[in-house]
Design a protein with these regions (language model features):
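Short, motif-level signal for alpha-helix interfacial/capping segments enriched in acidic residues
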Residues: 80-82, 125-129
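Functional transmembrane or membrane-interface alpha-helices that line membrane-embedded catalytic
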Residues: 128, 166-173, 196-199
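Coil-to-alpha-helix initiation sites in intrinsically disordered, low-complexity, charged segments
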Residues: 5-12, 22, 87, 91, ...
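Alpha-helical transmembrane segments of eukaryotic organelle membrane transporters
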Residues: 19-47, 52-120, 135-189
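Short juxtamembrane and helix-loop transition motifs at transmembrane-helix boundaries
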Residues: 128-136
Length: 221
């Protein structure tokens, strides 16, 4: 009777609402997913006794602004204008453009700059320079991790997903990927402590307290 048909009707209404408001859906879903991923990493992986709200804010803001707005425009408008449709050639070119151009040139510089800004509480050219210097140090590892996730997953993005579901799909995948970024690039306390002019013994003690048990900082004397 009514029970079995209620599920599809609810899903249908949700899908229709997302189709009517794709940008709002993109912003809400990607921001929530990014913040939730960092909360998961802090609680489950790093086992922190206290949630680092600055990190959660970083990933939430990053998800809502870059992924929710910028990537929405790039994926659903720019790339579709450049190579419309779902032919093998069009999908392959969009995957290549995303992984070889958009992510290295836009995604990672924005990610590192936002992280540096929220970590230090400063905004300026020097903040961007410091962020890009860190990006250069990590570029090969970051791109390797990124390509391992997004080459196969963007085949689904461009080959299967309708436009209004592309960003929710990307958000679902990036729940895991942003967690990886959080775990490998999210030690805000280390950044702040490194910039404060504290006695070496005091700084080392705080580093040891904040560091992971198996991290180089924890074992450093």
């Amino acid at each position: 009777g009514g029970g079995p048909s209620a599920g599809p009707s609810v899903l249908g209404r949700v899908n229709e609402a997302m189709r009517r408001q794709p940008l709002l859906t993109s912003i809400v879903v990607t921001g929530a997913k990014a913040a939730a991923a960092d909360l998961m990493i802090q609680a489950v992986v790093e086992k922190r006794a206290r949630v680092d709200e600055r990190r959660v804010a970083t990933f939430g803001l990053f998800g809502a602004t870059y992924q929710g707005c910028v990537q929405y425009f790039l994926f659903n408008h720019v790339l579709e204008w450049w190579r419309p449709g779902r032919s093998v050639r069009a999908v392959a070119l969009k995957i290549a453009a995303t992984n070889f151009c958009l992510d290295p040139v836009l995604f990672f510089p924005v990610f590192y700059s936002l992280r540096e800004m929220l970590a230090t509480g400063e905004l300026g050219a020097h903040t961007v320079r410091a962020a890009l210097a860190k990006y250069r140090e990590n570029v090969f590892e970051d791109l390797r991790n990124s390509w391992g996730v997004w080459f196969p997953c963007h085949a689904v993005t461009y080959g299967l997903m309708p436009l209004h579901l592309r960003m929710p799909w990307v958000a679902l995948v990036s729940f895991s990927y942003v967690g990886l970024l959080s775990f490998t690039r999210g030690d805000f306390d280390a950044i702040v402590l490194a910039e404060e002019e504290k006695p070496a013994a005091s700084a080392q003690a705080e580093f040891a307290e904040l560091a992971e048990p198996d991290s180089p900082m924890a074992s450093a004397e």
